[in-house]
Regions:
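Catalytic core of membrane glycerolipid acyltransferases/transacylases, capturing the structured
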Residues: 116-150, 156-158, 171-229
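Primarily EF-hand calcium-binding motifs
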Residues: 389-413, 417-424, 429-457, 467-486, ...
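A cross-family acyltransferase "interaction/gating" segment
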Residues: 210-218, 248-251, 258, 262-341, ...
């Protein structure tokens, strides 16, 4: 086929629609004709120092603001939605918002103040260094218990009246570390205050939080100093020292996943809890409630909405199950990752959920994709795995398609047959159909070529600096890198992250277009920003973001209907 035109064809995915021109029609609607007969973007304009700058470009790439595709069904542990379909339950929420919510808020505040008061008394005359050196004893330990009881009342006031305990808790000598999963919410800390408070691992900044900081200090946490380049090793050493100490330290609680998930699968455990090589006790958290109004994930409701919905239920339940102590084998003592993997398998089996190849690092990738306006950031990791399976990471086909993109037609409505031809991949390859389904968010049997190219180039270049990524996208927006018009320049800079909004991008264009010729070169843009300290973020490499390994284990999937 030629590269000058993409012809629509009937395909197995075209059952529900034969044509989808939403994106192209939007492109046309975003232009209007000025007094000189020139087509320009229809926008609202503001005047800055005598220069007219549009405040809001109407044009949006149709899929850049879509967080996750619904075209392919698989387990994504970082996406959560609340579905309340009953009109009675909705009415109950609004009624309790008036009648019960204010009382609960007052109860939470009073309980929190009581906990702070007990912590203040218990910490009187004790420095933070002393708290880190030796476990507290005597009357201070009694006040520590009272602080935990007061914090438990915070949750009771907030609707968590019941905690059902299963299994037998181990003593600190039997299992110095408690490995807790799944970690899905701020509510998970209810486990920490449900009895004699164990130690936690927390950021050093939490010690300075008003009210809560003093309460957290009283739990004698292991603080992580993020500004310290040796923070990881220091934290591991502190955990090892406590677990092997002869002092009467309380157990250390570690949420091994390292981030919140939706409990549909257990993601990779971080190995920090397993480096000491001591026995651990796995602890499971469950929330057997009608509605899940407290799961707080990367893509889901915000914390205020979750608090509101949680506190407007009559009550919520939490279930804590202590599994038998897991004693590591010599091989597991020598390999913390193997130890973490095997403990995760035991916990997943007890929870009756699968394990997933997702990890905390994937949240970093998805967050970066969202900042850079990449389509479907919630699916970008799965898209990345699929591209790797198709062998497209080592291919330059996406760059070739970028170079000819503006000369192609119907790029917003590419069917599966054309998609296979463009990528030069066998139409029968199941990974191709998976990739197509991930991009087919409209369920109309077509995908956007631009969305694919943005995703593909992001996955390949996510470790590079932003300026390199932007350079690779030029041909998606402008025929030439030497003559980039203002509207195309602004669209291109949408992918520079959240620090460059439309007004800043347009102001930057006018600063570069000193001769008022109506276009600039990308090289001029790069040279200008490289000298300005305010644009250093464009040249920062994200080397901590991992690349998938060929033949690596893929994320758990479920069959799509």
């Amino acid at each position: 086929m030629t590269t000058s035109s993409i012809k629509r064809r009937r395909s197995p995915h075209d059952a529900r629609a034969s044509n989808d021109g939403d994106g192209l029609q939007q492109e046309e609607n975003d232009y209007e004709t000025d007094s000189n007969g020139t087509r320009v973007l229809a926008t609202d304009a503001i005047d800055v120092n005598g220069v007219t700058i549009t405040a809001n470009l109407g044009k949006r790439d149709s899929e850049e603001d879509s967080w996750a595709s619904k075209g392919y069904s698989y387990i994504n542990p970082f996406v959560h939605r609340i579905q309340i379909d009953s009109h009675i339950d909705v009415a109950k929420i609004y009624v309790l918002s008036v009648l019960l919510l204010p009382i609960r808020v007052v109860g939470c505040v009073l309980s929190l103040l009581s906990a702070w008061m007990f912590a203040y008394i218990g910490l009187y005359g004790v420095s933070l260094e002393q708290l880190q050196a030796k476990p507290i004893t005597g009357w201070r330990r009694c006040f520590q218990y009272l602080t935990a009881r007061a914090m438990r009342m915070v949750y009771t006031s907030g609707s968590f009246h019941y905690i059902n305990f299963k299994g037998t808790p181990a003593t600190p000598k039997e299992a110095p570390i408690l490995v807790v999963a799944p970690h899905s919410s701020y509510v998970d800390s209810i486990f920490v205050v449900s009895g004699h408070p164990p130690s936690i691992v927390a950021k050093r900044e939490t010690a300075d939080i008003p009210l809560l900081g003093r309460i957290i200090n009283y739990a004698q946490p292991i603080y992580v100093q993020r500004e310290d380049p040796n923070s990881r090793q220091t934290t591991i050493r502190q955990i090892v020292d406590r677990t092997r100490s002869n002092d009467n330290w309380q157990q250390v609680v570690i949420f091994a996943e390292g981030t919140c998930t939706n409990r549909t699968a257990l993601i990779k455990f971080k190995p920090g809890a397993f480096y000491p090589g001591v026995p651990v006790q796995p602890v499971l958290l469950r929330y057997p409630n009608k509605y899940d109004t407290f799961t707080w994930t990367w893509d889901g409701p915000g914390v205020l909405r979750l608090l509101w919905l949680t506190m407007t239920q009559f009550y919520n339940r939490c279930e804590v199950e202590y599994l038998p102590v897991y004693t590591p084998s010599p091989a597991e003592v020598a390999d913390a990752n193997l130890y973490a993997h095997n403990v995760r398998e035991v916990m997943a089996k007890a929870l009756n959920v699968p394990t997933s190849d997702y990890s905390f690092e994937d949240v970093i990738v998805m967050s970066r994709a969202r900042e850079m306006k990449i389509p479907f950031p919630g699916d970008i990791v799965e898209i990345e795995h699929t591209l790797d399976s198709l062998g497209l990471f080592d291919s330059k086909r996406d760059m070739e398609l970028c170079d000819s993109f503006l000369s192609l037609s119907n790029t917003d409505t590419v069917d599966i047959i054309t998609f296979a031809e463009l990528l030069q991949v066998d139409l029968q390859n199941p990974e191709l159909h998976k990739l197509f389904a991930l991009l087919n968010h409209r369920h109309k049997g077509t995908v956007s070529l631009k969305s694919f190219l943005l995703c593909s180039l992001f996955c390949k270049l996510k470790n590079c600096d932003i300026i390199t990524f932007l350079r690779s996208l030029i041909k998606l927006y402008s025929p030439s890198s030497q003559q980039i018009e203002r509207q195309n320049f602004v669209r291109l800079l949408r992918h520079a992250g959240g620090k460059l909004n439309e007004q800043k991008a347009q102001a930057l264009f006018f600063a570069l277009d000193v001769d008022n010729v109506g276009h600039i070169s990308f090289d001029a843009f790069a040279q200008y920003t490289e000298k300005q300290t305010s644009y250093k973020f464009l040249y920062h490499k994200s080397e901590h973001i991992r690349r998938p390994k060929t033949n690596a284990a893929k994320t758990t999937t479920v069959t799509s209907n």
